[in-house]
Amino acid sequence: ISCSLVGSEMCIRDSSFTYGDNNFMLYFYIALCVILLLFIIMTFYLIIIRQMTVQKFYIPVALFLGLIFQCLVTVHGVPDEPTHFDAAYSLSNKMLFVKNTETPGNTIYKRRCDAQLSDMLSNGLETNSYYQLLFHSFEFASDTDLIEISYVSTSGLVPAVVYVPAAIGLSIGRLLHLSPMLTFQLARICSLVVFILLVYFAICIAPFGKNLLGALGLLPITLQQAASASYDSVINGFIFLFTALCFYRLHNPKRKKSYLIALGFLALFIAIVKGGVYLPLLLLLLMCFSHVPHPHMHKKMRWIVPLCICVGAVLLIAVTLIKFMPMFSAMFATDISADPENTIYPISYVFQHPLQTIYILWNTIIQCSDTILRGLLGGKLSWLDININWSLLIVFLIILLLLVNVKGDTPVFTRKSRTFIAFSCLGSLLLIMFSMMVGYTTMDCDHIQGIQGRYFLPLAPALFSLFSTSMVSVDHNRSCKIWETMMVIESLVVVQAITMII
């Protein structure tokens, strides 16, 4: 077999076949359009004819649309997915009792065929990825010998639980000796299913904002991340569920042990992911537990809940600091004297130059706010190189603002509750920006680099709930029409994306 590079396409030839063109992509495009037509028919039946609520139609719609996005944005088509696959593969080795490598450093055992496919696929979307998906998925693995490869560990940033769904999919594929492409796709399907179930539970638990949660769980960027090996599927799902539980506790002060245990677990999870940037969301706990106490509660007992909250907050902050201390120490120790123009901003710079830091934050908001909003609504797919038309994204934004005001599902907050929600979102937003400033941005830049809209998805349920207003009221019939409009726009996003690829 000889390999030659012609333009940007790889041509592989042997005595029996030749491929190097993308003519098969035309058939893929036609098939995708037919599938989208079936999707529109299904949603029209469920939403318009049957008049189903979001609790009833979310799972089939999210699963159907998620699988479409999984085929559209193929393996390695999501930012940093190769790293996520390796982390999930490491966990899969433990599930299958594969011994650790004896080489010092970050190395793992991997099936030779899986390693070869990983090396073959590029980061992003290109015709070879679709060729492998269409013609080499339903095969058995040809070479399952384990070889040692190096990988980048993410254990310092997230707990292993975020890779459990993908690791289960990888383990199933390896046990059944499935092809590398199908094995990777199984990992992505497991991640998608777990995310859909988490959002479904959030929708069922939330006393209000069910339509908002469902719409956020169907945004293109949300489904792209959910239908991949990225840890975003579990992180977004857990924080959506956490927000729903907080709203439930605010609306229904009666204690339910299972919900309290879930809140405790999710609060701990939030404290130990992504450097603690979502830690301010724990203010939602303070909001729901600082509710007016029961009138028959003894006065001394009324102090127990606030005291427990304060102690818990201190413990969670301590856990965050301990978990990420090596990373924080490295950021503090950055030497800016050697080459300040090519050195990343250290944490000490933020404290030593507060006015300059505020200036950088302001510049970031002015220069990058449209890009961030575009990314949040799903306008920058794959490795940020699939740009969706703004006209479609504006419709998504209008739909979110309307669905948060559906009659009987509109969030009702006191001024105190709105203040808690606003400060929790603002705090997380600032921490995300600061983390990218001291972890990615070089000192020759006057704005923060690397911020993506998907980083703010966990804040979206709480943030968009603040836009509930008595000036807008959407009845059920109109909400069904709004939902069907969203399904049509989702289909148009897929069509635009695939036309940009072929």
Positions of PLM-derived features:
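Membrane-interface alpha helices of multi-pass inner-membrane proteins
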Residues: 224, 259-275, 280-286
